[in-house]
Every structure is written in C-alpha cells, then in structure tokens.
Amino acid sequence: INTLSGVHQPTRGEMYTDGKPVSFSNPKNAQEMGIATVHQFGGTYPLMSIGRNFFAGAEPTKGFGPFKIFDRQKANSIAVEQVQRFGITRITDGDRLVGGLSGGERQSLAIARAVYFGARVLILDEPTAALGVKQAAHVLRIVNEAKRRGLAVIFITHQVMHAMAVGDHFAVLIRGAIAADFRKGDKTREAI
C-alpha cells in the first residue's frame, strides 16, 4: 500500500501508469496521478461535519483576496450530493458530524471523496474490517459502483468472501510474497 501510494520507494521492480513507468517521491505525486488510498477506518474526522470531512485540505472558499472564508454551504451541498450518488440517501445534512455515521457510511464518504477528487485507482485497505454484515455489504456495493464508474480498485482484505464479491483478478500474499495469482472463476473459495 505504501509503495503504491508514494509513501515508500520500491526496492525493486517497476510501477506503470497508462503503460508508462512511474515513481512517486511522496503521496502527493501518487494523488496527482489519480491514485487514492482509503485506509481501514476511512481517514475521517469524527468531530467534523460531513462537508468539512469531504473537503479536508481542499476546502472551497468564498470572498476575495485575503478575505476568503470556507464556503460551508457549497461544501455541504457537494458532499451530500456525492455521497448520495453512491446510494447513501439517508445523509441529507452536510453539517452532520461524521461521528454519528456508521462505519460503512464513513467508508462510503471516503470513497465518494476520492472519486470526486479524480481518483482513477482506488486502494482500499481492509474497508470491511470491524463492520457488521449489513455495513460490509453496503461497502461492497459501493466498491462495485466505483468499478462500474471505471475506477481500478485494489481491494486489500483477509475476507475471502468479500474479495470474491468485488474482485476480477486476485493476488494472494503471504509475508509480502505472491503465493497465488488468478482471475475470477479460476479457483473456488475453498481452493483459495
């Protein structure tokens, strides 16, 4: 995850984007190439609003010159619209605190944010960990929706059933080494 998202440099091998070799010296370089990482707990801030979380670090402003202020209405409107596009229709107020959302809704917020800001590759680190069955199913639907929209998704999980629900191509790692590499339908869940 850290190599793909620009935190660490690869010690060997090459990475390619659009058929061209790339290297990232920092996470911002990876983001500029359209690679977004959503970590296990979504990277949200529980005591901040949905609108503030959605735009953390890239807040829309209004005003002129040195007198610009955060445009809360615009941030809330866009955040609610984008989250609803991913099927979370019960979120209607961008001023609502993220701490009041379920784990699945927090993951969905983080995914919607990544898509809005131009992600083409979405790295999801254990997005269903610590979620209940219903919340995990919701996150899996969101992941499939992201795929339907044309995003490449790297879904990291220990849950074989979750991987099978969203994956097309699988790599099984044991202590960082590839133990198996196959496509959907090549192996049964039991064989994995």
Each predicted region: which residue ranges?
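Glycine-rich phosphate-binding loops of nucleotide-dependent enzymes
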Residues: 1-192
